[in-house]
Design a protein with these regions (language model features):
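A metal-dependent hydrolase metal-coordination microenvironment
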Residues: 1-100
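C-terminal functional module detector
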Residues: 8-11, 30-33, 75-82, 88-323
Length: 323
C-alpha cells in the first residue's frame, strides 16, 4: 500500500460534505538551479479517482509542461479534474513569468492555452514572503515591499546560482506578471498569465496557526522557542535567511456555493477567490455597467451582482455605448 493511498484514505476519512472539506492534493516541487517553480496540484475528486494514478514528481521532470501533460492524462483516464497553483514567484529568479518555455524557446499560442487552462490561480503571499510586487517595480506605491520582502530578495529559493537582480523582477512578481500576460495576449491571441489570487501558508507542520502571536513556523525546527528568531534557514551570496524573515501568512478565501470538494474546486477554477495575509476578511465585489445605488442596500447583494454583472475573477467586457 503506497503512501499516496494512505494519504488519500486520510482525506477521505475526514471529508464531511457540508461541514468540513478535506481536499486531495500534493506539491510538485520543481526547483531548477534553485529557482522556485513549485505548484500545488488540487483534485476536484475523491479517493476513487485519485488512487488511479500516482502523483507526477519533479524527480520525473522539472518542466511545468510535463506536469500539465500528466494532468491532462489524469483527466482523460479518470474523468476527474485538476488545477495547479504556482507559488513563490518571488523566489524564482525571474522564471515564474519568463517569456520563454522551460527549454528557452519563445512562448507559443499552444503553450499559452495550456498554461491558461491548468494554472488559473497564483499564490500572492505565504510564509516565504510576498510575491505581489517589489519597490523597484512600483516606486510610487508606498505599500510595495511593506511586508514580505526582507530576506527573500537575496536570491532564489536555495540561494544558489546567482543573486536576485532588478532585471529579473518583471518576470517574477505577480503584478508585473499580469502585465506580461496582456502583452502576450496581444501577440499570441491568448493570455498565459490570466490568474486569480489566493494566499497560503506553505508550512510543513500541518498547522494553520498563522496569527503573529500563535505562529508555529514552517518546519519543526522553527516552532516557538526563545531563540527561534535567529535560526539559520539558508545561506548564500554572503547573506543569511533567518526564521524572523518568515511570515505568519496567509489564507485562501473561496466564494463557493457549498462546503464540498466540488463546489470549492469549481469556485477556484472560475477564480472567485482572494487571498489575505491571515486576517479573516470578508471581501466580495462584482463588476458591470447596470448597477444602481439601491443594489448596495439589497438584502441579496450577490443576486444583483450576478444578474447585472460578473463576479470577482470574471471577464468584464468593453462597456456598451454611453456607459
Amino acid at each position: 500500500k503506497s503512501v499516496w493511498q494512505q494519504y488519500t484514505a486520510t482525506a477521505e476519512k475526514y471529508n464531511d460534505p457540508g461541514r468540513f472539506t478535506a481536499m486531495i492534493g500534493y506539491e510538485w516541487t520543481s526547483v531548477p538551479g534553485g529557482n522556485n517553480l513549485h505548484r500545488n496540484v488540487l483534485f476536484r475528486d475523491g479517493k476513487d479517482k485519485a488512487d488511479q494514478v500516482f502523483p507526477f514528481s519533479s524527480w520525473q521532470s522539472e518542466d511545468p509542461e510535463k506536469l500539465w501533460a500528466w494532468m491532462d492524462q489524469y483527466e482523460t483516464r479518470t474523468g476527474g479534474r485538476l488545477l495547479a497553483i504556482p507559488h513563490n514567484g518571488n523566489l524564482s529568479n525571474g522564471r515564474m513569468f519568463e517569456l520563454t518555455d522551460f527549454s528557452g524557446q519563445p512562448l507559443t499560442r499552444d503553450y499559452a492555452e495550456r498554461r491558461a487552462r491548468w494554472e488559473v490561480l497564483q499564490e500572492i503571499v505565504q510564509t516565504k514572503g510576498n510575491s505581489e510586487t517589489h519597490p523597484t517595480l512600483a516606486p510610487n506605491d508606498e505599500f510595495a515591499g511593506d511586508m514580505g520582502i526582507a530576506g527573500w530578495e537575496y536570491g532564489n529559493l536555495t540561494l544558489e546560482d546567482k543573486p536576485e537582480s532588478p532585471e529579473m523582477r518583471p518576470t517574477m512578481y505577480l503584478r508585473a506578471g499580469l502585465l506580461r500576460g496582456l502583452e502576450q495576449e496581444a501577440k499570441l491571441g491568448v493570455n498565459p498569465f490570466k490568474f486569480g489570487l489566493v494566499g497560503g501558508t506553505d508550512v510543513h507542520n500541518s498547522l494553520t496557526a498563522i496569527e503573529e502571536d500563535n505562529y508555529f513556523g514552517k518546519h519543526v525546527n522553527q516552532e516557538p522557542s526563545p531563540h527561534r528568531w535567529n535560526h539559520v534557514s539558508k545561506q548564500g551570496f554572503g547573506k543569511t535567511r533567518y526564521t524572523w524573515h518568515y511570515l505568519a501568512a496567509g489564507y485562501a478565501a473561496v466564494w463557493a456555493t457549498e462546503n464540498t470538494r466540488e463546489a470549492i474546486w469549481d469556485a477556484m477554477k472560475r477564480k472567485e477567490v482572494y487571498g489575505t495575509t491571515g486576517t479573516r476578511l470578508t471581501v466580495r465585489f462584482f463588476g458591470g455597467y447596470d448597477y444602481q445605488p439601491a443594489d448596495l442596500n439589497s438584502r441579496n447583494f450577490a443576486w444583483a451582482g450576478y444578474q447585472k454583472g460578473v463576479p470577482m475573477g470574471g471577464d468584464l467586457t468593453k462597456a456598451p455605448a454611453g456607459k
